[in-house]
């Protein structure tokens, strides 16, 4: 949810000494002037004065902090003056400092309060205005950076508020000046539309609601709806009733509403209310009894359930009282509440509750204010226009606000407005469902879904459910999203189906949630909803058979959709099989027979892990070439459990084994490190078999080893993985470097591990071995996977492990069997070679000797080349420009290229990939698109394309063939060649 605060990018390399010096200087600067919170609980502060002393008073009529506020009963053009300690706004302070307060206005007016900041000479260098256009509490937040004024004199000794040219009064509370670090996501609103220029960046989409409010519909409002239009609108509303219907609300949700209401202590006062202050989470202090949007949600939803399902008149009365109070507190049309970021996650039930209460809302005296609030906070106003093609952070909007937008559209009292709003919403949704460029949020061309500038399945769940639900609501009506949009959406569904086994994904794809996250029931239901909206396969069927079959595989209960699909002859799909390339995530997914392997790296455009202050603190190695086997339908069943997990030993990774206090992220805020290397990702042949490769390098940070490098490749054929590593080097002489084979939960009654056929199943077991080609080591983990190591010092253990919780650093414990190749301390050009045989059958073990199934042609820092005997595939991971002497097909292959080929009769099937997205701008998120990369390979003999390819071209020079291939988006280019 939270937008990261500190991002490590591949083009930003901070020198440690400069960082320390900068932090030291900032601390000195901040130490000179302290943020001052002005309290009115003990009377009028001495530094405040007004044009007339009688204008100021302390009031209990309204408050936003404590139980009292400052009442200013002003005369025309009165001045409220506040003296402060000298504040010198150097460049750093001018960029970061500001002021925050809340102002209560009893009646909407057309004028403003003027704020001015004065130098010792009385010069006004900074100023801004605050519109009094709304009644109730409104936030007044602004940094000096965004104020008006000539900004010539930087010393401020006094500031003042100038009243309008009339009599009136306002109440002031929650005043802090100077604020040392203004909230970057300060939200423009009706009162202060220009208090933050950053909100025009799509990254701050939450804060753009007032900007979007200025949009005008370019869709005409119909004079009247036709009968067909009215019927379609009614169908959508009826379906929404069904979606939101509860068989019986939980007593807990109703009880929570009454308990929260009791704590809120809402009382009418003059023209407004007193009660628990409602503020954004960023300034919330629950120890003082303050509340936020989720408390409004708790009260409104609980009272709505009690009123709707139990016919409680008391609940109905309280429902509307809470609405009046919330609007008075600033949860209202045109209000930004200081900052509104991520509010969508806290208001969704407000909308579903409003739908249940819609008839009563339409009859209520405050109907207009309630509906305008619902419309504004749903951000429906953005949909008055089509979605811009470069809109960022779409997953948040789809997930949290698509249903609120839908409900808000249908809450309008005029059916013509409802119809137009729904048309606009569908157009916006359809135009947002396109393949977005660069690393901004949305769906990528390979089906990956992006959030926080990266491939993020944890944010995809819920998104699929929300859009799928909308499609089910609008199916068969004019409001249905376009076929093109649904086709893009399908690619995200298929991708999630591929990288989940059955519902869960691997740790490498987990972002900041390493042991959690899965497809939910609503996501699964949306497979059916999208299928029923129409065929997307091009076969001309009445519905999409592929999605329907996937739904039957994933859904285990009973539903009308399941019954329908089965009646149409659809059978549950088998689990996906093949090798799937997702290079927008530098990832490959290898699948057969209900198991799944997640292979994960990182590069200049793909971050390796998301680490927050309280999330995934030890997740540094998630993308260090991880090779995680999920042999069962869940992580736990596959042997992965956080309790006692050694964060240094994610299978497949090459890592320096650190104490947890050193593995813990050195940055207190967010770390999303990208590499300086481009070459990391996957390639496939016929989507059946594939390669994963990574040029591993570690960043230059505290407790990192900046010269740690390695070159790693995993060749995936059928149910075998050949893992090669070369150039493993670093100067860390304190802690050993390891390549982890496996780490899995050990159970006393389980299979334990096998070493060269001998079972070991005793807690505390540990054995060291040296593997050679003449005497390889054969291991079997407790989950029927076998490991054949041909090079290196191998260590195996069954141990009771002490670990740390990834969020709170508390001690955790668990029993695990583990095996790894020990490269020693400060290795130089270390190597490894091992084969993983995934769940071989008894028949396979009788008929196949796994080490005879492949040949390593080359394994050094220039290239890893393997020939697979069983499939006949030859695969190349080329790190540096390569010239080949004895190859049957290639003479030269350029650096950072993956190639796979297979001969068949007189033809050869070829796949070529560069996983580099080649995005020009290296930033947290960027709209800069993936750019084409030209690759020239030289083939021996004359070859020609069997059929034309838009991305491959051949030219003949003598008895050689120049093969030019255009790679883009990290998508493999596959084609067939034949001898000329």
Mark where each language-model region is.
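Extended polysaccharide-engagement surfaces of secreted carbohydrate-active enzymes
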Residues: 470-909, 913-942, 969-971
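Aromatic-lined, polymer-binding surfaces characteristic
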Residues: 226, 230-520
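Extracellular carbohydrate recognition
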Residues: 151-154, 163-178, 184-188
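Bacterial Sec-dependent N-terminal signal peptides
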Residues: 1-36
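Extracellular ligand-binding interfaces
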Residues: 72-149, 166-168
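Extracellular beta-strand elements of beta-rich domains used
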Residues: 142, 159, 173-177, 834
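Short carbohydrate-recognition loop motifs
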Residues: 58-79
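Extracellular carbohydrate-recognition regions
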Residues: 34-53
